[in-house]
A protein has these predicted regions:
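Structural motif
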Residues: 78-80, 111, 162, 195-197
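N-terminal beta1-alpha1 cap of cysteine-dependent amidohydrolase-like domains
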Residues: 1-93, 102, 206-210, 214-229
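Pocket-forming structural segment of enzyme catalytic cores
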Residues: 123-184
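Cofactor-binding loop segments of dinucleotide-utilizing enzymes, especially the Rossmann-like FAD-
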Residues: 44, 115, 198
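C-terminal and late-domain segments of enzyme folds
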Residues: 2-3, 167-229
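Hydrophobic anchor at the start of a short beta-strand
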Residues: 61-63, 110, 193
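Cysteine-nucleophile active-site neighborhood
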Residues: 83-149
Length: 229
């Protein structure tokens, strides 16, 4: 299912780069495009800036999320790769745990990448009914790249960069496995929540972000078709 290519991976994964600075909203030209979907990117640590750039190219309005107030009015959320322990401690420090659970529970589309998959699992936020193994493929020197066929993603294989990546060791019946490597799930979906063990943003891969936006569009269309009570 995956054609792996060792090497050629820039430092990242559970990384220390992209440490959060002062809160700011991101938009081209400093203005929110009219009618654009507002997608939050958790910006406590990690490679959140790469996600904001991809969202901008897709016409969405990214917002860096550091405190609960930043979650207000979001149409979707991305939890990026980085150091899962640092991100988890930041969530606890800023009081983001319950607000993040409520956001996911409301049906808002959520995507977690690499460390984001860990943050979403049973042992952390508990948003996804999965249990993961950290650094499952080995440490930094065992990082690799692979082309994966993902269920629900058209246009050929997704180029995936695995850096100190996790894999899923256990999941509930309500979790759909979208891709595997070495017979272990590395991409999953449970309702409105997606998680992948790799870094699409480091490869310039936009289809996972499009999947998030497409899920949002279907949710909006379904709500509109029901009309007022």
């Amino acid at each position: 299912m995956a054609a792996a290519r060792p090497g050629g991976v820039s430092p990242g994964g559970e990384t220390s780069r992209g440490t959060a600075g002062p809160p700011r909203k991101v938009s081209p030209g400093g203005e929110t495009p009219r009618g654009a979907n507002v997608i939050g990117v958790l910006a406590l640590q990690g490679d959140f800036e790469a996600h904001t750039k991809i969202l901008q190219t897709l016409g969405a309005q990214p917002r860096e999320v550091r405190v609960p107030a930043d979650l207000a009015g979001l149409d979707g959320l991305i939890i990026p790769g980085g150091e899962s322990t640092v991100i988890t401690l930041g969530i606890e420090r800023e009081g983001l745990g319950d607000p993040l659970r409520e956001l996911a529970g409301s049906g808002t589309p959520v995507l977690g990448t690499c460390a984001g998959m860990i943050v979403l699992d049973r042992d952390h936020l508990g948003v996804l009914d999965i249990r993961v193994q950290r650094n499952a493929f080995g440490r930094q020197l065992r990082s690799f790249e692979a082309d994966l066929e993902l269920v629900g993603v058209d246009g050929g294989p997704v180029h995936a960069i695995f850096i100190r990546a996790p894999w899923v060791v256990e999941h509930g019946a309500g979790v759909e496995v979208l891709a595997q490597v070495q017979a272990h799930p590395v991409a999953v979906r449970q309702g409105n929540v997606f998680a992948v063990a790799f870094h699409p943003e480091l490869a310039g891969e936009t289809r996972l972000h499009k999947l998030l936006l497409d899920t949002l569009a279907r949710r909006t269309a379904d709500a509109g078709s029901r009309g007022p009570c």
